[in-house]
Each structure stands twice: as C-alpha cells, then as structure tokens.
Amino acid sequence: MQEYARYGSDWKTLQNNLIGFERSDSRNLDITYVAQTATILGFHDLAKWCKENDLPLSMGVVNNPDYLGPNSLPNHIKQMVLKKCTDIKVDVSQNMLSDYESVDVKKMLHNIERSKFNLALHDKFKRYIKWYESSKPDITPLIDIFPELYDLDNQQGLV
C-alpha cells in the first residue's frame, strides 16, 4: 500500500530506514497514519507492523476532501475495517507536530461506524483515483490492490 499512497517510495527500503532511525540513541520516531478511503484496508497491516517493531503510531482521519473521508466508504468496507481493527492495541503518540488532533483506534472506528455511505462521494473518489493513476503508468491500480472498494452490491442506506 505504501508504494501506491506514496508513489515512488519503496516499502522495504522505508522499513529498514525507519527501524534503523528508531534504534539510534538520540532520536524518537512516530509513524503517522491518516485514515482515508484509498488506504483504510491497509491500516491493519501498518498497525501490526508498528506493534511488531515497537513503533508508536499517531493517527488522524481525512475529512477534506470529503470523497476521501469515511462517508465514501461502502458499508461492507466499514464492516471489514471494524472487524479487523476491533482488537488492535495501538500506542497513539501525543507528540504531533501538527495543528490536527490525533485520534485513537477506538475513536477512528467510532467515526467510521457512524458515517453514512454516500454514493456521490464514492463516485468522486473513483474519479479521483482514475485521475491519480492516469499520470503513473507503472502503478498497480487500486482496483487490483483492493477490489472490494469497488464492489457496491447490497449497499444499504445509499444517499
């Protein structure tokens, strides 16, 4: 997922750099995850990796643009995320160099659970992804990484 969200990066190289940086005596490192539609299904793997490597994880939620926020998540995706993340214990750092408040997993899951799926926002999200991928001919399409994001069968409460 890292290579998709941060086009041009290499996850294996980044892993080695982060772990090496964290192990140096004079430095502290926080990993910051911002929950958004394109990456939400990779959160569980990131949280697990941070836990395995004893790295604190700060979190936020995208609200703007709205098509990357929780209201663009299909209902079955919300359920998948809730199921995978319910038991995660994540060390949320409070040392944010940001104006935005970090949130814990419980609050993030609550925000996702309370959100109402909006088909128009989901359509905007898909148009954004199409635009994003159009300038990156060698990128693996998001539909191949997370095809379930594109499955809209049996959505309840469509707006």
Task: Spell out what each predicted region is.
Residues 1-5, 67-69:
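A short acidic, helix-capping loop that chelates divalent metal ions and anchors anionic groups
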